Amino acid sequence: MYTLKDDVFKGMRPQIHEEAFVAPQVFLSGDVRVGKYSSLWPGVVARGDVNYISVGECSNVQDLVCLHVADDAPCIIGDYVTVGHGAVLHGCEIEDHVLIGMGATVLTGAKIGRGSIIAAGALVKENDVIPPNSLVVGVPGKIVRKQDRMETIHAQAIKYKCEWAIEYGVKPDIGGELYHGEKII
C-alpha cells in the first residue's frame, strides 16, 4: 500500500481514503484526494501543485496515467470511472460512469459527460464539452454516436474495485455489488 513520504507541496498533502488502494509505485504530490474503494495502479503520477486533483469513489486509474492541473482548472474524476493505461488528464472534469481509453488525452477545461466513452488514443481538446453518453474517437476527438454501455462501464469499475480489494484484504462489497465471471452479482 502507498505510504505518504515527502509528498507535501506548499503545505498540501495527498488525502487517501483508508479503503482506497494506491500502489507503492505511484507518485502523488500536493492536493490530491482519492475516494473510497478507488485504486491508483503502478506508475500513476498525480501532481496537485497549483490546483487540486479529486478521484471519486470506486474509480480506477490504471498504470502510467498522468493527472495534472492548471492554475484555473482542477482535475476532477467522478465515481465509477475507469482511466485506461497511459492516459493523460490535464485540468479537466470527468463525470461519473465514464471510460477513458488507453492513451487518450483530455486537455484543460474539457468536460466529459456522464456515461461517455473516450476511445483509446483519442484527443479531447481544451474546453471541449462532451455531452453525456457520447462515444468520442480520433485526433482531434469527434463524437461519433451516442452509446448505451453504462452497465459495461459500471462493471469495469466494480471489477477493478473487487480485484484489488480481495487481493489486499479490503472489504469489497460496497452496496452489495461484487464482480464475478464478467458480471456484477
What kind of region is each of these model predictions?
Residues 30, 42, 48, 63, ...:
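Residues on the solvent-exposed faces and adjacent turns
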